[in-house]
Amino acid sequence: MDKQLNDAPCGFLALSEEGSIIAANRTLIKILDYEPEQVIGQHMNMMLTIPAQLFCQLYFFPLLKLEHHIEEIYISLKARDGEEIPVLINAIARHDSGASVFDCVLIPMRKRNEYENELLIARNEAQEALLAKQKANAELEIALETLKAKQEELLEINKQNQQFKLNTKRELELARKIQKNSLTEPIVNDQVQIDSYYNASSELSGDLYGYYQIDEHRYGIIILDVMGHGISSALITMSLHPLFQRQITQGLSPVKVMKELDRHLHSLFQNDEEARHYCTAIYLEIDIARQRIDYVNAGHPPALWQDDSGTQHLLHATSPPIGMFEDLEFQSSSLSYTEDGRLLLYTDGVMDPTASCYLFDLLKDHPDSPIADLKEKILTSLQHQKEAHHKSDDECFILVDVK
Protein backbone atom coordinates (compact mmCIF):
# COMPACT_ATOMS: atom_id res chain seq x y z
CA MET A 1 0.00 0.00 0.00
CA ASP A 2 1.50 3.38 -1.01
CA LYS A 3 2.11 6.09 1.61
CA GLN A 4 -0.57 8.44 0.29
CA LEU A 5 -3.29 5.79 0.61
CA ASN A 6 -1.94 4.55 3.93
CA ASP A 7 -2.16 8.03 5.48
CA ALA A 8 -5.26 9.23 3.60
CA PRO A 9 -7.79 11.24 5.68
CA CYS A 10 -10.26 8.37 5.43
CA GLY A 11 -10.27 4.66 6.09
CA PHE A 12 -9.42 2.14 3.35
CA LEU A 13 -10.28 -1.54 3.43
CA ALA A 14 -9.74 -4.36 0.93
CA LEU A 15 -11.93 -7.42 1.45
CA SER A 16 -12.12 -10.87 -0.04
CA GLU A 17 -15.40 -12.12 -1.45
CA GLU A 18 -16.00 -13.94 1.86
CA GLY A 19 -15.50 -10.77 3.89
CA SER A 20 -11.92 -11.44 5.10
CA ILE A 21 -9.72 -8.35 5.50
CA ILE A 22 -6.91 -8.33 2.93
CA ALA A 23 -5.60 -4.83 3.61
CA ALA A 24 -6.39 -1.82 5.79
CA ASN A 25 -4.70 1.57 5.87
CA ARG A 26 -3.16 3.15 8.97
CA THR A 27 -5.95 5.71 9.22
CA LEU A 28 -8.63 3.04 9.68
CA ILE A 29 -6.53 0.97 12.08
CA LYS A 30 -5.85 4.07 14.16
CA ILE A 31 -9.57 4.99 14.25
CA LEU A 32 -10.42 1.50 15.53
CA ASP A 33 -7.46 1.42 17.97
CA TYR A 34 -6.08 -1.90 16.69
CA GLU A 35 -2.66 -3.11 15.65
CA PRO A 36 -2.31 -4.16 11.98
CA GLU A 37 -1.68 -7.80 12.90
CA GLN A 38 -4.95 -7.85 14.87
CA VAL A 39 -6.93 -6.87 11.76
CA ILE A 40 -5.36 -8.37 8.63
CA GLY A 41 -6.77 -11.81 7.86
CA GLN A 42 -9.76 -11.41 10.18
CA HIS A 43 -13.39 -11.32 9.03
CA MET A 44 -14.87 -7.87 8.60
CA ASN A 45 -17.39 -8.69 11.38
CA MET A 46 -14.70 -8.01 14.00
CA MET A 47 -15.02 -4.27 13.35
CA LEU A 48 -18.82 -4.14 12.95
CA THR A 49 -21.67 -3.73 15.39
CA ILE A 50 -24.19 -6.59 15.41
CA PRO A 51 -26.80 -4.71 13.32
CA ALA A 52 -24.05 -3.76 10.87
CA GLN A 53 -22.94 -7.41 10.65
CA LEU A 54 -26.46 -8.45 9.73
CA PHE A 55 -26.80 -5.58 7.26
CA CYS A 56 -23.54 -6.45 5.52
CA GLN A 57 -24.38 -10.15 5.29
CA LEU A 58 -27.90 -9.68 3.93
CA TYR A 59 -27.54 -6.47 1.90
CA PHE A 60 -24.06 -4.98 1.52
CA PHE A 61 -22.19 -8.01 0.12
CA PRO A 62 -25.07 -9.29 -2.10
CA LEU A 63 -25.59 -5.80 -3.56
CA LEU A 64 -21.86 -5.27 -4.14
CA LYS A 65 -21.59 -8.62 -5.92
CA LEU A 66 -24.58 -7.72 -8.08
CA GLU A 67 -23.88 -4.05 -8.87
CA HIS A 68 -20.04 -4.12 -8.51
CA HIS A 69 -20.14 -0.77 -6.73
CA ILE A 70 -21.86 0.90 -3.77
CA GLU A 71 -22.07 4.55 -2.82
CA GLU A 72 -22.75 6.20 0.55
CA ILE A 73 -23.90 3.21 2.58
CA TYR A 74 -24.23 4.14 6.26
CA ILE A 75 -23.16 1.61 8.92
CA SER A 76 -21.56 1.63 12.38
CA LEU A 77 -18.05 0.34 13.07
CA LYS A 78 -17.01 -0.97 16.48
CA ALA A 79 -13.66 0.11 17.91
CA ARG A 80 -11.60 -2.14 20.16
CA ASP A 81 -13.02 -0.44 23.27
CA GLY A 82 -16.60 -0.95 22.03
CA GLU A 83 -17.18 2.62 20.84
CA GLU A 84 -19.54 2.87 17.85
CA ILE A 85 -18.17 4.92 14.97
CA PRO A 86 -20.68 5.93 12.25
CA VAL A 87 -19.22 5.88 8.74
CA LEU A 88 -20.24 6.20 5.10
CA ILE A 89 -18.89 3.46 2.82
CA ASN A 90 -18.13 3.68 -0.89
CA ALA A 91 -17.04 0.38 -2.42
CA ILE A 92 -16.16 -1.21 -5.76
CA ALA A 93 -15.59 -4.81 -6.80
CA ARG A 94 -12.55 -5.72 -8.88
CA HIS A 95 -10.64 -8.84 -9.89
CA ASP A 96 -7.09 -9.48 -8.72
CA SER A 97 -5.31 -12.63 -9.92
CA GLY A 98 -8.63 -14.26 -10.70
CA ALA A 99 -10.19 -13.51 -7.30
CA SER A 100 -12.84 -10.94 -6.43
CA VAL A 101 -11.62 -8.09 -4.21
CA PHE A 102 -13.83 -5.39 -2.67
CA ASP A 103 -12.11 -2.02 -2.16
CA CYS A 104 -13.90 0.15 0.41
CA VAL A 105 -13.44 3.77 1.48
CA LEU A 106 -14.83 4.56 4.95
CA ILE A 107 -15.56 8.18 5.88
CA PRO A 108 -16.15 8.83 9.62
CA MET A 109 -19.26 10.90 10.44
CA ARG A 110 -18.61 11.72 14.11
CA LYS A 111 -17.27 15.25 13.60
CA ARG A 112 -20.58 17.08 13.90
CA ASN A 113 -20.37 17.65 17.67
CA GLU A 114 -16.78 18.71 17.31
CA TYR A 115 -17.78 21.29 14.71
CA GLU A 116 -20.53 22.64 16.97
CA ASN A 117 -18.09 22.95 19.87
CA GLU A 118 -15.64 24.73 17.65
CA LEU A 119 -18.38 27.19 16.67
CA LEU A 120 -19.02 27.97 20.34
CA ILE A 121 -15.31 28.49 20.94
CA ALA A 122 -15.12 30.79 17.93
CA ARG A 123 -18.06 32.86 19.23
CA ASN A 124 -16.44 33.17 22.68
CA GLU A 125 -13.22 34.25 21.10
CA ALA A 126 -15.11 36.93 19.17
CA GLN A 127 -16.69 38.23 22.40
CA GLU A 128 -13.35 38.32 24.17
CA ALA A 129 -11.85 40.17 21.21
CA LEU A 130 -14.52 42.86 21.47
CA LEU A 131 -13.68 43.38 25.18
CA ALA A 132 -9.97 43.54 24.53
CA LYS A 133 -9.78 46.81 22.63
CA GLN A 134 -6.11 46.60 21.83
CA LYS A 135 -6.65 43.28 20.00
CA ALA A 136 -10.24 43.81 18.92
CA ASN A 137 -9.81 44.41 15.20
CA ALA A 138 -7.35 41.60 14.48
CA GLU A 139 -8.94 38.94 16.69
CA LEU A 140 -12.47 39.79 15.55
CA GLU A 141 -11.46 39.33 11.93
CA ILE A 142 -9.95 35.93 12.67
CA ALA A 143 -12.95 34.83 14.71
CA LEU A 144 -15.45 35.88 12.03
CA GLU A 145 -13.55 34.01 9.33
CA THR A 146 -13.35 30.93 11.52
CA LEU A 147 -17.06 31.14 12.27
CA LYS A 148 -17.94 31.44 8.61
CA ALA A 149 -15.86 28.42 7.70
CA LYS A 150 -17.37 26.29 10.45
CA GLN A 151 -20.90 27.34 9.51
CA GLU A 152 -20.30 26.29 5.94
CA GLU A 153 -18.97 22.94 7.10
CA LEU A 154 -21.97 22.43 9.37
CA LEU A 155 -24.40 23.35 6.58
CA GLU A 156 -22.71 20.86 4.28
CA ILE A 157 -22.91 18.12 6.90
CA ASN A 158 -26.59 18.89 7.49
CA LYS A 159 -27.20 18.76 3.76
CA GLN A 160 -25.52 15.36 3.55
CA ASN A 161 -27.51 14.08 6.51
CA GLN A 162 -30.80 15.26 5.00
CA GLN A 163 -29.97 13.60 1.70
CA PHE A 164 -29.08 10.39 3.49
CA LYS A 165 -32.42 10.45 5.34
CA LEU A 166 -34.31 11.01 2.07
CA ASN A 167 -32.45 8.17 0.36
CA THR A 168 -33.09 5.85 3.30
CA LYS A 169 -36.78 6.76 3.35
CA ARG A 170 -37.11 6.00 -0.37
CA GLU A 171 -35.32 2.68 0.03
CA LEU A 172 -37.55 1.69 2.97
CA GLU A 173 -40.69 2.64 1.06
CA LEU A 174 -39.60 0.53 -1.90
CA ALA A 175 -38.79 -2.39 0.41
CA ARG A 176 -42.20 -2.03 2.08
CA LYS A 177 -43.95 -2.19 -1.31
CA ILE A 178 -41.93 -5.25 -2.32
CA GLN A 179 -42.76 -6.97 0.97
CA LYS A 180 -46.47 -6.17 0.64
CA ASN A 181 -46.62 -7.27 -3.01
CA SER A 182 -45.16 -10.65 -2.06
CA LEU A 183 -48.25 -11.48 0.04
CA THR A 184 -50.73 -13.91 -1.50
CA GLU A 185 -54.19 -12.91 -2.73
CA PRO A 186 -57.42 -14.35 -1.22
CA ILE A 187 -58.57 -17.79 -2.41
CA VAL A 188 -62.27 -18.42 -3.03
CA ASN A 189 -63.65 -21.64 -4.53
CA ASP A 190 -66.18 -24.37 -3.73
CA GLN A 191 -63.76 -26.01 -1.25
CA VAL A 192 -62.25 -23.16 0.78
CA GLN A 193 -62.32 -19.42 1.28
CA ILE A 194 -59.10 -17.84 2.56
CA ASP A 195 -58.58 -14.19 3.46
CA SER A 196 -55.94 -12.35 5.51
CA TYR A 197 -54.85 -9.09 7.11
CA TYR A 198 -51.36 -7.62 7.41
CA ASN A 199 -50.22 -4.40 9.08
CA ALA A 200 -46.59 -3.50 9.84
CA SER A 201 -45.82 -1.51 13.00
CA SER A 202 -43.05 0.35 11.11
CA GLU A 203 -41.98 0.63 7.48
CA LEU A 204 -41.05 -3.07 7.40
CA SER A 205 -42.43 -6.09 9.22
CA GLY A 206 -41.09 -9.32 10.68
CA ASP A 207 -44.44 -11.04 10.04
CA LEU A 208 -45.10 -12.95 6.82
CA TYR A 209 -47.64 -15.44 5.52
CA GLY A 210 -48.61 -17.38 2.42
CA TYR A 211 -51.31 -19.78 1.29
CA TYR A 212 -51.39 -21.86 -1.87
CA GLN A 213 -53.50 -24.52 -3.61
CA ILE A 214 -51.15 -27.50 -3.91
CA ASP A 215 -53.37 -29.74 -6.05
CA GLU A 216 -57.05 -30.48 -6.60
CA HIS A 217 -57.77 -31.24 -2.94
CA ARG A 218 -54.83 -29.88 -0.89
CA TYR A 219 -54.01 -26.40 0.40
CA GLY A 220 -50.91 -25.17 2.26
CA ILE A 221 -51.07 -22.27 4.74
CA ILE A 222 -48.09 -20.78 6.61
CA ILE A 223 -47.59 -17.81 8.93
CA LEU A 224 -44.25 -16.70 10.45
CA ASP A 225 -43.02 -14.15 12.96
CA VAL A 226 -39.29 -13.33 13.08
CA MET A 227 -38.00 -12.01 16.42
CA GLY A 228 -37.79 -8.22 16.60
CA HIS A 229 -39.09 -5.57 14.20
CA GLY A 230 -37.87 -3.41 11.38
CA ILE A 231 -35.20 -3.90 8.75
CA SER A 232 -33.30 -6.92 10.11
CA SER A 233 -36.47 -8.96 10.75
CA ALA A 234 -37.93 -7.97 7.38
CA LEU A 235 -34.77 -8.99 5.51
CA ILE A 236 -34.95 -12.43 7.11
CA THR A 237 -38.66 -12.91 6.30
CA MET A 238 -38.05 -11.94 2.68
CA SER A 239 -35.23 -14.46 2.42
CA LEU A 240 -37.62 -17.16 3.73
CA HIS A 241 -40.50 -16.26 1.38
CA PRO A 242 -39.31 -17.78 -1.94
CA LEU A 243 -38.12 -20.87 -0.06
CA PHE A 244 -41.43 -21.75 1.59
CA GLN A 245 -43.40 -20.75 -1.53
CA ARG A 246 -41.45 -23.27 -3.62
CA GLN A 247 -41.63 -26.04 -1.02
CA ILE A 248 -45.35 -25.68 -0.34
CA THR A 249 -46.36 -25.61 -4.01
CA GLN A 250 -44.22 -28.72 -4.57
CA GLY A 251 -46.32 -30.50 -1.93
CA LEU A 252 -43.59 -31.15 0.65
CA SER A 253 -44.85 -32.35 4.03
CA PRO A 254 -45.11 -29.89 6.96
CA VAL A 255 -42.08 -31.52 8.61
CA LYS A 256 -39.94 -31.13 5.47
CA VAL A 257 -41.06 -27.53 4.97
CA MET A 258 -40.07 -26.59 8.53
CA LYS A 259 -36.80 -28.51 8.28
CA GLU A 260 -35.77 -26.55 5.18
CA LEU A 261 -36.72 -23.20 6.73
CA ASP A 262 -34.72 -24.11 9.85
CA ARG A 263 -31.71 -25.12 7.75
CA HIS A 264 -31.91 -21.82 5.85
CA LEU A 265 -31.97 -19.73 9.04
CA HIS A 266 -28.94 -21.56 10.45
CA SER A 267 -27.05 -21.06 7.18
CA LEU A 268 -27.64 -17.29 7.33
CA PHE A 269 -25.80 -16.96 10.64
CA GLN A 270 -23.27 -19.79 10.53
CA ASN A 271 -20.37 -17.28 10.73
CA ASP A 272 -21.94 -14.99 13.32
CA GLU A 273 -23.67 -16.53 16.31
CA GLU A 274 -24.30 -13.14 17.95
CA ALA A 275 -26.47 -11.96 15.04
CA ARG A 276 -28.60 -15.11 15.04
CA HIS A 277 -32.39 -14.66 14.82
CA TYR A 278 -35.10 -17.22 15.42
CA CYS A 279 -38.58 -17.40 14.00
CA THR A 280 -41.88 -18.85 15.19
CA ALA A 281 -44.02 -20.42 12.48
CA ILE A 282 -46.97 -22.71 11.89
CA TYR A 283 -47.61 -24.57 8.62
CA LEU A 284 -50.85 -26.43 7.91
CA GLU A 285 -51.67 -28.72 5.01
CA ILE A 286 -55.44 -29.09 4.54
CA ASP A 287 -56.56 -32.19 2.63
CA ILE A 288 -60.20 -31.65 1.64
CA ALA A 289 -60.63 -35.17 0.25
CA ARG A 290 -59.36 -36.86 3.43
CA GLN A 291 -60.92 -34.23 5.73
CA ARG A 292 -57.66 -33.89 7.59
CA ILE A 293 -55.27 -31.12 8.64
CA ASP A 294 -51.58 -32.00 9.11
CA TYR A 295 -49.49 -29.32 10.76
CA VAL A 296 -46.23 -28.38 12.47
CA ASN A 297 -46.28 -25.55 15.01
CA ALA A 298 -42.76 -24.27 15.71
CA GLY A 299 -43.18 -22.19 18.86
CA HIS A 300 -45.99 -20.11 17.33
CA PRO A 301 -49.22 -19.01 19.08
CA PRO A 302 -51.76 -21.84 18.66
CA ALA A 303 -54.00 -21.77 15.60
CA LEU A 304 -57.73 -22.27 16.17
CA TRP A 305 -60.08 -24.74 14.45
CA GLN A 306 -63.80 -24.19 15.07
CA ASP A 307 -66.30 -26.66 13.63
CA ASP A 308 -69.91 -25.96 12.64
CA SER A 309 -71.15 -26.85 16.11
CA GLY A 310 -68.93 -24.14 17.66
CA THR A 311 -66.45 -26.57 19.24
CA GLN A 312 -62.94 -25.14 19.24
CA HIS A 313 -59.62 -27.01 18.99
CA LEU A 314 -56.23 -25.38 19.51
CA LEU A 315 -53.28 -26.42 17.35
CA HIS A 316 -50.55 -25.99 19.96
CA ALA A 317 -46.79 -25.87 19.40
CA THR A 318 -45.24 -29.22 18.50
CA SER A 319 -41.62 -28.00 18.25
CA PRO A 320 -39.37 -25.08 19.32
CA PRO A 321 -39.00 -22.05 17.00
CA ILE A 322 -36.97 -22.50 13.83
CA GLY A 323 -33.40 -21.24 13.87
CA MET A 324 -33.04 -21.83 17.60
CA PHE A 325 -31.36 -25.26 17.81
CA GLU A 326 -29.17 -27.17 15.36
CA ASP A 327 -30.42 -30.49 13.94
CA LEU A 328 -33.88 -30.02 15.41
CA GLU A 329 -36.35 -32.84 14.73
CA PHE A 330 -39.77 -31.32 14.00
CA GLN A 331 -42.91 -33.14 15.12
CA SER A 332 -46.16 -33.01 13.15
CA SER A 333 -49.71 -33.44 14.40
CA SER A 334 -53.02 -34.06 12.66
CA LEU A 335 -56.61 -32.96 13.11
CA SER A 336 -59.43 -34.86 11.41
CA TYR A 337 -62.81 -33.25 10.86
CA THR A 338 -66.21 -34.48 9.70
CA GLU A 339 -68.01 -31.20 9.11
CA ASP A 340 -67.30 -27.74 7.78
CA GLY A 341 -65.19 -25.48 9.95
CA ARG A 342 -63.18 -22.31 10.27
CA LEU A 343 -59.46 -21.75 10.94
CA LEU A 344 -57.76 -18.74 12.51
CA LEU A 345 -53.98 -18.26 12.32
CA TYR A 346 -52.32 -15.15 13.74
CA THR A 347 -49.13 -13.59 15.10
CA ASP A 348 -48.66 -12.36 18.65
CA GLY A 349 -49.39 -8.77 17.59
CA VAL A 350 -53.14 -9.53 17.60
CA MET A 351 -53.16 -11.11 21.07
CA ASP A 352 -54.47 -9.45 24.23
CA PRO A 353 -51.35 -8.70 26.34
CA THR A 354 -53.30 -9.40 29.56
CA ALA A 355 -54.96 -12.69 28.59
CA SER A 356 -55.27 -15.41 25.97
CA CYS A 357 -56.32 -14.57 22.44
CA TYR A 358 -59.64 -12.70 22.75
CA LEU A 359 -60.37 -13.47 19.09
CA PHE A 360 -61.38 -17.02 20.05
CA ASP A 361 -64.48 -15.65 21.77
CA LEU A 362 -65.18 -13.38 18.83
CA LEU A 363 -65.22 -16.38 16.44
CA LYS A 364 -67.42 -18.33 18.82
CA ASP A 365 -69.91 -15.46 19.06
CA HIS A 366 -70.18 -15.10 15.27
CA PRO A 367 -70.08 -18.65 13.86
CA ASP A 368 -72.23 -17.85 10.82
CA SER A 369 -70.68 -14.52 9.84
CA PRO A 370 -69.14 -14.46 6.35
CA ILE A 371 -65.37 -14.15 6.36
CA ALA A 372 -65.51 -10.55 5.10
CA ASP A 373 -67.79 -9.52 7.98
CA LEU A 374 -65.75 -11.46 10.53
CA LYS A 375 -62.56 -9.80 9.27
CA GLU A 376 -64.10 -6.36 9.87
CA LYS A 377 -65.16 -7.37 13.39
CA ILE A 378 -61.60 -8.52 14.13
CA LEU A 379 -60.13 -5.25 12.82
CA THR A 380 -62.54 -3.24 14.99
CA SER A 381 -61.56 -5.33 18.00
CA LEU A 382 -57.86 -4.87 17.21
CA GLN A 383 -58.29 -1.10 17.10
CA HIS A 384 -59.96 -1.14 20.52
CA GLN A 385 -57.13 -3.27 21.91
CA LYS A 386 -54.48 -0.88 20.57
CA GLU A 387 -56.23 2.12 22.09
CA ALA A 388 -56.71 0.38 25.44
CA HIS A 389 -53.17 -1.00 25.79
CA HIS A 390 -51.21 1.50 23.64
CA LYS A 391 -49.86 -1.37 21.57
CA SER A 392 -47.56 -0.98 18.58
CA ASP A 393 -46.71 -4.31 17.00
CA ASP A 394 -46.85 -6.05 13.65
CA GLU A 395 -50.35 -7.45 13.09
CA CYS A 396 -51.17 -10.40 10.90
CA PHE A 397 -53.94 -13.01 10.77
CA ILE A 398 -55.48 -15.50 8.32
CA LEU A 399 -59.09 -16.69 8.21
CA VAL A 400 -60.01 -19.95 6.43
CA ASP A 401 -63.46 -21.39 5.81
CA VAL A 402 -63.32 -25.11 4.97
CA LYS A 403 -66.52 -26.07 3.13
Swiss-Prot record:
**A Pfam family hit:** SpoIIE
| Conditions for induction | Induced by entry into stationary phase, but not by carbon and energy starvation.
The kind of enzyme this is, by top-level EC class, is hydrolase
Protein known as: Phosphoserine phosphatase RsbP
Q: Which gene encodes it?
A: rsbP
What the protein does comes down to: Positive regulator of sigma-B activity. Dephosphorylates RsbV in response to energy stress.
Reaction(s) the record says it catalyses: O-phospho-L-serine + H2O = L-serine + phosphate; O-phospho-D-serine + H2O = D-serine + phosphate
Positions of the PPM-type phosphatase domain? 191-402
